[in-house]
Amino acid sequence: MRGKIKILDIETGNLAIFINPEDAEQWRIHPNDLVKIESGKRYIYGSAFIGNIVEKGEIGISKDVLSIHQFSNGEIVSLSPAGTPESVKYIKKKMRGEKLKKVEIETIVRDIVDRKLRNTEISAFVSAIEINGLDMEEIAALTIAMAETGDMLDIERKPIMDIHSIGGVPGNKTNVIVVPIVAAAGLTIPKTSSRAITSAAGTADVVEVLTNVTLTLEEIKRIVEKIGACLVWGGALNLAPADDLMIHVERRLSLDPRGLMLASIMAKKYAIGSQYILIDIPTGKGAKVESMEEARSLARDFIELGKRLGQYVEVAITYGGQPIGYTVGPALEAKEALETLMTGRGPGSLVEKAIGLAGLLLEMGGAAPKGKGKIIAREILEKGKAYQKMREIIEEQGGDPDIKPEDIPIGDKTYTIHAQTNGYVTAIDNRGITAIAREAGAPEDKGAGIRLHVKVGDKVKEGDPLFTIHAESESRLDKAIVLARRLEPIKIEGMVLQVIENL
């Protein structure tokens, strides 16, 4: 069938293609059938919607379709039934618990990227992996397929270093300090980061307070070849595009299969050509990984997968039992990170973690002798070399290199929670702190978040400030206050827990 494109001012949440009932009957197209639109070398798959919203001879497309391929009103295109994708039988194979071959995994990933598979089929694939798992051979094949169906970055400056934290700990602005330290030592580190999904700030959200993070692959290549580093948002790039489509389904199902998590992280590293990768696994109560046993098991998987991909991987299991530094939220974290870079000093939890991780990367890349990386990383930070490199990164990405911490606007609607008793801080609930910061507006409102006044082990008196909530609107602040009072994320106890009387 050939017809004229009609752009419809609607969003459906999927790739909807609207067909007049007469055309649908003539071409034997049924509701929700997979159909293909072609125009020259451009093509897209979508679900058929039958209705009189379009006239006979018209093919209606939603805004969702336009977000992937640009078609113009009145453009002549061809439309045809697509049939059942070949990959569906491979998904059924995994549902039966059978091992998938490399070519079968490649077919599934290609069909996901081409949008031949809808959310129902992708959900079945994700669920099959959750139930039956993937072995390391399958994970490696999936990783490579995810990377090679997207764009690949070719950087000539070697060696190429990379770092990734699996997250789960609020206030983790560590990589904003690690990256300039590593680059200042002469190594290459093109860091792509995510925005917050369930946290109060992703690395990209924090860096965006200081400079532009939405760059093209060509711009990244130019910057990295020139200064050895970047701090950009990976979501603006076509890196491992199947990953985003699968993550969308995982979130809806509240699933996070280990095999997919490993492939998701390593596919993006493979796509940008990372040779030496440090994985940070924060571990502790309230973190994504709560036990050392689970952390060690995950570490072994990362190392084994790296070997299969030709990448050298080391894993740092770090303390994740409370927030890193004293701030949570994009602007608050950017301010704290910039202060640390400018002065070479900062909260112990932030500085020690940053130089510890940076030191490992220096040793991995040959910029420091074994066992001396942390010392050299500290020196680079304290002598201002990391700050100078951060200025270069900010400027090359389109920001003002002269930005100062006091230039960063923070939410001016504030409320401070105080201690109700004397004692010691025995625990800070990571999930509670994150929930309150998000209720205050983070990460969408850059100035929203939480400033902690105490950490675990601190002695407090009744009336002492525990944390301050920052928001950009009174309504957001009020909601955050209600949640803070309900959750009580900071626990205070006396040294004497109970007295047993001699009766």
UniProtKB/Swiss-Prot annotation:
It catalyses: AMP + phosphate = alpha-D-ribose 1,5-bisphosphate + adenine; CMP + phosphate = cytosine + alpha-D-ribose 1,5-bisphosphate; UMP + phosphate = alpha-D-ribose 1,5-bisphosphate + uracil. Keywords: Glycosyltransferase, Transferase. The active site is at D256 (proton donor). It holds the Pfam family Glycos_trans_3N. One of its GO terms (molecular function) is pentosyltransferase activity. AMP binds at G168, S194, R195, A196, I197, T198, S199, T203, S264, K288. SUPFAM superfamilies: ADC-like, Nucleoside phosphorylase/phosphoribosyltransferase catalytic domain, Nucleoside phosphorylase/phosphoribosyltransferase N-terminal domain, Pyrimidine nucleoside phosphorylase C-terminal domain. Its EC number is 2.4.2.57. GO terms for cellular component: cytosol. InterPro entries: AMP_phosphorylase, Asp_de-COase-like_dom_sf, Glycosyl_Trfase_fam3, Glycosyl_Trfase_fam3_N_dom, Glycosyl_Trfase_fam3_N_dom_sf, Nuc_phospho_transferase, PYNP-like_C_sf, PYNP_C. One of its GO terms (biological process) is pyrimidine deoxyribonucleoside metabolic process. Coiled coil: none annotated. Belongs to the thymidine/pyrimidine-nucleoside phosphorylase family. Type 2 subfamily. NCBIfam families: AMP_phos, ARCH_P_rylase, PRK04350.1. Catalyzes the conversion of AMP and phosphate to adenine and ribose 1,5-bisphosphate (R15P). Exhibits phosphorylase activity toward CMP and UMP in addition to AMP. Functions in an archaeal AMP degradation pathway, together with R15P isomerase and RubisCO. This is AMP phosphorylase. It comes from Pyrococcus furiosus (strain ATCC 43587 / DSM 3638 / JCM 8422 / Vc1).
